[in-house]
Amino acid sequence: GHFYHGGTGSSVHADQHCLGSGVTTGIDAGSSGFLNYDAMRDYVFPAHQTRLLALLHIGAVGLAANRILGGGLHDMRIIDVDRTAETIKENQGGLLGVKVRMHMDAVAYWNAPIAMKLAREAADKSGGLLMVHVSGTPIPLPQVLDHLKSGDISTHAFNGYTESILDNSGKVRKEVREAVDRGVIMDVGHAGVHCDVEVVKSAMNQGMVPDTISTDIHLAPPGRSVYLMNDLVSKFHALGMSLPDTIRASTWRPAQVLRLQDNLGSLVPGMAGDAAVFDLREGRFVWHDMAGHNVEGKVRLDPFLTVKGGRIVWQEGRLSQMGEC
């Protein structure tokens, strides 16, 4: 998601979107760069109950002007590989790696290969992972995937743009399968326009199931819907994943991918002590995408209680009326 609240036009207040959906830990996906990360770390993140970590944008100021300029990589002078890598190394535990947006509005096709190369260099120098926004890429998807190594993340992987994980015949591209085989993570990164129901169905029918389920929660432009985590888990269950698999893809698996599995993602002794309790509601529920495709399901996870570090940080209204428990 994007949690540099007050620092970018697309960021949200994490507590208002995470805790009430059963989420205790949010990963900011490149809202800040090396020039403004300190402000996000020192003044924004501490004002939240939600545990917040981040990926550092390859551009110096992240998404500070994305709602005005459309993206942060229109001029390659905004990238400084060494300062980006140094910032990540100086903030181990808070910064997990590098984020680069390969979207046609964020970077021109003639600059996209350069931005990918520099993002790869910064990730390697920092020792962190590389997350790439692949939805709407101005260059062929295989060229983007060529830069990704084991443990790196292809987010918005199930988008419906021309350069999606499917080829023109609707088959999963061989380059995508090769990337998965070498350990590249296929992340949902749902957002409002970056997850196409028909692409998900086709990919899953061919054995390409999401590694991780994420919201890319942000302040959406008018006319767009952005789902919270409990709805996404429910939606992907309706799309054919088992409920245990959807839960794993939104808890334990992301913790592994982000190298946080020693503290987060499960309830074994010694972990942070985070948990979420849901009502499993039965009925008729419909989720949609911006292409007009709908998914109908029979169950939905409704948040009831969220616990972080062994302490209740959010509770549904009925529980408040019951008193202390």
Q: Residue locations for each model-derived region?
A:
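Aromatic/hydrophobic pocket-lining residues that form π-stacking "cages" and hydrophobic walls in ligand
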Residues: A14, A39-M40, T84, A119, ...
